[in-house]
Amino acid sequence: MPPTPEVGLPLWLLAELTYRCPLQCPYCSNPLDFAAQGQELSTEQWFKVMAEAREMGAAQIGFSGGEPLVRQDLAQLIAEARRLGYYTNLITSGIGLNEARIADFKKAGLDHIQISFQASDEQVNNLLAGSKKAFAQKLEMARAVKAHGYPMVLNFVTHRHNIDKIDRIIELCIALEADFVELATCQFYGWAHLNRLGLLPTRAQLERAERITNEYRDKLKAEGNPCKLIFVTPDYYEERPKACMNGWGNLFLTITPDGTALPCHGARQLPVQFPNVRDHDLHHIWYESFGFNRFRGYEWMREPCRSCDEKEKDFGGCRCQAFMLTGDASNADPVCAKSTEHGIILKAREEAETAQLAIEQMTFRNDRNSRVIARG
């Protein structure tokens, strides 16, 4: 067994400021029971979190949610992060954004804004978002972000209901003069896992979308267009797992709205007691807490991971995915073809070939559905 690697620094801090959100995306990665979570951290508590993380080496902070724009202290949080020396990202739907707030964020020192879209056409975008005004607002704010001197960074979550229009999505991004476009095929955590039958593309859909994306890359390069297209494939069509978060508690630190500290944004669902910043400082949380040490190193591994010569590369894959699909977070990620549970993934691929779940039939991410799920 290789020696346990030294614990890395929490270089990337994800500040999930709130679970409140005006949209209802059925692929949201937030916990299913978000409506039953505790009170949000105050401005001062977030200041303390940011200061402690910065002292430990954190260099980049992402303000996320839910929808972070619902926090009225967002400009204050950005300004404090800037003062502390962070590179600052705002990850937003654009709903709740306006010219005045963009100017405020610019003045506060915000470095980067990413706006998400649900689709390239208004009807599908608004249906998925659960809002009749979402698409027009997103278009307006994408242009406004660019006008204020920010690079235009767009994120499209692709799935079986919009991936066949990947060419239209890319054309929209080109028309908007986007600088970076993330074409992120749905990853199946949170609400997306619940709605997998309505979201997972077929292999043919995925291969076609990737081919078209590559054709557009060649076209953009030939035209001298600097727009960068980033295509993210789903785990379900891989034969080896990803090195999730570059290893458990090794680089990435999430703080949830109520102050729970997690080694990744999906870990809250695990049957592990994670610490809270209301009770402990981040140094204790990162280096000493049970939750952050639970899956570090290799001693926790079972076969086939334990004797696998690839374990130092992929760390056994995603613990959350192992738990969701096998019921035990210590098992190998079933995405891996070496896993005895890989048949779960093969079955999901087969089901995608015949799935008939329409957008309207999916369980949308909203307070009502979350409360029902929380009650069991």
Swiss-Prot record:
[4Fe-4S] cluster binds at C21, C25, C28. Its EC number is 1.21.98.4. InterPro entries: 4Fe4S-binding_SPASM_dom, Aldolase_TIM, Elp3/MiaA/NifB-like_rSAM, MoaA_NifB_PqqE_Fe-S-bd_CS, PQQ_synth_PqqE_bac, PqqE-like, Radical_SAM_PqqE_MftC-like, rSAM. Binds 1 [4Fe-4S] cluster. The cluster is coordinated with 3 cysteines and an exchangeable S-adenosyl-L-methionine. Keywords: 4Fe-4S, Iron, Iron-sulfur, Metal-binding, Oxidoreductase, PQQ biosynthesis, S-adenosyl-L-methionine. Pathway: Cofactor biosynthesis; pyrroloquinoline quinone biosynthesis. GO terms for biological process: pyrroloquinoline quinone biosynthetic process. PANTHER family: PQQA PEPTIDE CYCLASE (PTHR11228:SF7), RADICAL SAM DOMAIN PROTEIN (PTHR11228). Catalyzes the cross-linking of a glutamate residue and a tyrosine residue in the PqqA protein as part of the biosynthesis of pyrroloquinoline quinone (PQQ). This is PqqA peptide cyclase. It comes from Pseudomonas putida (strain ATCC 700007 / DSM 6899 / JCM 31910 / BCRC 17059 / LMG 24140 / F1). The lineage of its organism: Bacteria, Pseudomonadati, Pseudomonadota, Gammaproteobacteria, Pseudomonadales.
